[in-house]
Amino acid sequence: MPAIRLPDGSVRQFENPVSVHDVAASIGAGLARAALAGRVDGALVDTSFVIDHDVDLAIVTDKDADGLGILRHSTAHLLACAVKELFPEAQVTIGPEIENGFYYDFSYKRPFTPEDLVAIEKKMAELAKKDIPVERYELPRDEAIAYFKSIGEAYKAEIIESIPQGEVLSLYREGNFTDLCRGPHVPSTGKLKVFKLMKVAGAYWRGDSKNEMLQRIYGTAWAKKEDLEAYLHMLEEAEKRDHRKLGRQLDLFHIQDEAPGMVFWHPKGWTLWQQVEQYMRRVLIANDYQEVRTPQIVDRSLWEKSGHWAMYQDLMFTTESEKRDYAVKPMNCPCHIQIFNQGLKSYRDLPLRMAEFGSCHRNEPSGSLHGIMRVRNFVQDDAHIFCTEAQMQPETAAFIDLLQAVYQDFGFDNILIKLSTRPEKRVGADELWDQAEAALAAALAAKGLAYELQPGEGAFYGPKIEFSLKDCLGRVWQCGTLQLDFNLPVRLGAEYVSEDNAKKHPVMLHRAILGSLERFIGILIEHHAGAMPLWLAPVQMAVLNITEAQAEYATEVAETLKKQGFRVDLDLRNEKISYKIREHSLQKLPYQIIVGDKEKAGALVAVRARTGEDLGQIPLSQFIERLKSELLH
């Protein structure tokens, strides 16, 4: 006689074992119709799951985040079902839920076309309308292998062959289609009403470039039509803001095949870069960081000592000279410890904050490269804080203050935080992990910051905090990190003399605020749609003459502004003023200064702001004061 406790604290008693669906129906017919799954003692299960003992139960609907995930995963299965009906020779592989949607990988004799996607989506809608039951059943491992081989699904059989002997596997059947899956899934296809197929891309089987190239169909699924429409609108906006397109339009940078994943910065783009880097340099100096510079190429022996050679070699660019193996550094931390190790350090020297705008190289797969957001050569605003165990919490708190101030200056107020704690495989005593996790949590609590706890997601050498930005389109970008490390200082022999005259290893805090400068600049470009704030704009204003008669005065105006430290373009071309204004507007300049005969005669300037505001004719000195005031804010 199971007693079932619901989220509101009420308890329902049942005479016999009962399914999740039956419990929902006992509460109300509306909830029974809305139920997509259940959460039994914290575990997600199908609505058909039978409860035969006392449990805590929550009914999952499309209003829950879990419910949306189940909708998307189930829509991936619906996609596979539709593909198999239309293209029986296609073989199915994997089809997970992803952020904002799902995908499914197929092996097929020819590429899927845009017309195929239209037909597949239409078939999915037909199958959804039929409200086909989705049924879960189990098979022993070897029977499951035999079943998938018998229907020609070699990839599914291969997946199961990698599962240990003796396992019982769950399968889901909807109509004529059966898939291997842990679930849970919606009770029937009729729950899947709001979806759209987005694109086809290539993907290697098991993510290995040595394997066959499969076809990955991406889609999106939502609970309500309005949610889908809002998402598609966001994608339209994101396309307009695509940093790759704006990078070309605004003449900021380019990437070419001869240097994949590496950026050619143009003068305007490099000016933007310099504004970001110089700002961060001022911030570092104000917060007692010491800037250093370390080598690009380091002997293999150091990477072996640090553990990177064993754990990270596939992502490292290597070379050989004079019978010695070298690696181009993928990160800066081992080199910073080499500087720390020069000379005896005392506890009085700690905390020691060491920063570097370090150029790193990682051999990322070519398929993962994306503009300047995902590159092979990047610069981090990297720093390492060497401190005592007692200093972990105050250093964490100081870093959080610094990070929040920096993000605010760049126009980001919405910060999401995750705290990742000890994984199963780790180094260091549990007491040290207790202290480290408590230090990070206490620093966040002291600031009144909400965070998502991610148990077991820390690195093997220490817990970490991740900071993500939410941009104007609601997209989330992970940028900042704070990572405690008990391991690397020990491996590389970093020591200091403690207050009791004993040699101890410092705790090392790996920290970054922007992360990769390339990626952060890409985020800035998309967040601002290329219309950078005055302080960041590569060109802050253009001075335009109407006719040749004002050329000399326009030059004087431009020179005066340059002497005040502003970044100015002077446009004396013999073109119509309307043409020049339009051209500079497309470059998204904060201001345009137009000088004609009236302005010249009155020693004035006519100013147009990017916002559409017309400042009228004003003395140049008054405009300069406005600019200085704007830069202060």
UniProtKB/Swiss-Prot annotation:
GO terms for cellular component: cytoplasm. Binds 1 zinc ion per subunit. Coiled coil: none annotated. Its EC number is 6.1.1.3. Residues 242-533 are annotated as: Catalytic. It is found in: Cytoplasm. The keyword Zinc applies. Its cofactor is Zn(2+). Signal peptide: none annotated. Residues 1-61 form the TGS domain. Zn(2+) binds at residues 333, 384, 510. Its main location: cytoplasm. Keywords: Aminoacyl-tRNA synthetase, ATP-binding, Cytoplasm, Ligase, Metal-binding, Nucleotide-binding, Protein biosynthesis, RNA-binding, tRNA-binding, Zinc. One of its GO terms (biological process) is threonyl-tRNA aminoacylation. The keyword tRNA-binding applies. One of its GO terms (molecular function) is metal ion binding. It comes from the Bacteria. It catalyses: tRNA(Thr) + L-threonine + ATP = L-threonyl-tRNA(Thr) + AMP + diphosphate + H(+). Homodimer. Catalyzes the attachment of threonine to tRNA(Thr) in a two-step reaction: L-threonine is first activated by ATP to form Thr-AMP and then transferred to the acceptor end of tRNA(Thr). Also edits incorrectly charged L-seryl-tRNA(Thr). Belongs to the class-II aminoacyl-tRNA synthetase family. This is Threonine--tRNA ligase. It comes from Laribacter hongkongensis (strain HLHK9).
